[in-house]
Design a protein with these regions (language model features):
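Conserved GTPase G-domain signal focused on the G5
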Residues: 154
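Hydrophobic alpha-helix immediately C-terminal to the catalytic Tyr-X-X-X-Lys motif of short-chain
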Residues: 126, 130, 134, 164, ...
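Surface-exposed alpha-helical interface segments used for non-catalytic interactions
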Residues: 34, 73-76, 162, 190, ...
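C-terminal substrate-binding subdomain of Rossmann-fold SDR/epimerase-dehydratase oxidoreductases
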Residues: 4, 22, 166-243
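A conserved catalytic-core signature of glycosyltransferases
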Residues: 93, 159, 182
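N-terminal Rossmann-like NAD(P)+-binding domain of SDR-like oxidoreductases, especially those catalyzing
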Residues: 1-150, 199-200, 234
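Amphipathic alpha-helical segment in the mid-to-C-terminal domain
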Residues: 119, 157-158, 189, 236
Length: 243
């Protein structure tokens, strides 16, 4: 929802004036490689948080090119800019959808994720592979975050929590599949923000003199993956009743 994004920006701009922070907004498509590169050259960012993507599983079934353009080509342009800049840490959004058809719960970062069941999941897995490769080749410290069903104020209107809430306020019935015998790991937006904030200044480190003492399992590469979730299964009907 473009209007939702514009409203978010207006709130940030008002807060920026009040707090006297040096915050700038640039309207830029990640496919605009030259414009993106000019921003990096001029402002020389030290930290990059990439939350830009074409999201959603169902939409990807009929709109493949939008996912390739945004999540693959756009991500490539961004990480190339990081490569040619003195970036201290790149944090990027992956997704819990990369776990695909895994049936071993709870999901763990060291599980295999080689069988995505949607194009969206495949693009997010690709992001992880690309970030790992750039960390290996160019020593870019990077962290991928696999988010689990994020909800909260200003959330995406196509997500279940917002759809449920809208139907409740409109006094419309809520469509429930599988008789409600579904569970999800719902993650509140404030927890996501806190996670990113805490990780930003703590990139993965590699002890090249003594690689075995490095904090990452792939000790030659400053790249890591974290699950970001509530850590508890919530029954769908319980969630609806809480709303």
């Amino acid at each position: 929802d473009v209007n939702l994004k514009k409203s978010r920006i207006e709130i940030i701009e008002k807060s920026n004036k009040y707090l006297n922070k040096k915050w700038r907004f640039f309207k830029c498509d990640l496919l605009e490689k030259l414009k993106l590169s000019e921003i990096f050259v001029k402002y020389k960012p030290e930290y990059v948080i990439n939350l830009a993507a074409q999201a959603g599983v169902r939409y990807s079934l009929d709109n493949a090119n939008e996912y390739i353009n945004s999540n693959i080509l756009g991500f490539t342009n961004l990480i190339e800019c990081c490569r040619h800049s003195d970036i201290k840490h790149l944090i990027y959004a992956s997704s819990s959808s990369v776990y695909g058809g895994n049936i071993n719960f709870p999901f763990k970062e060291d599980q295999g994720v080689n069988h995505p069941v949607s194009l969206y999941a495949a693009t997010k897995k690709s992001n992880e592979l690309m970030a790992h490769t750039y960390s290996e080749l160019f020593k870019i410290p990077s962290t991928g975050l696999r988010f689990f069903t994020v909800y909260g104020p200003w959330g995406r209107p196509d997500m279940a929590p917002m759809i449920f809430a809208k139907n409740i306020f409109s006094q419309k019935p809520i469509k429930v599949f599988n008789n409600g015998n579904l569970t999800r790991d719902f993650t509140y937006i404030d927890d996501v923000v806190e996670t990113i904030y805490r990780l930003l200044s703590k990139p993965a480190t590699v002890n090249y003199a003594n690689p075995m003492q490095s904090e990452v399992s792939d000790f030659a590469c400053p790249h890591r993956i974290f699950n970001v979730g509530n850590g508890k299964e919530v029954n769908l009907l319980d969630f609806i009743n809480t709303l």
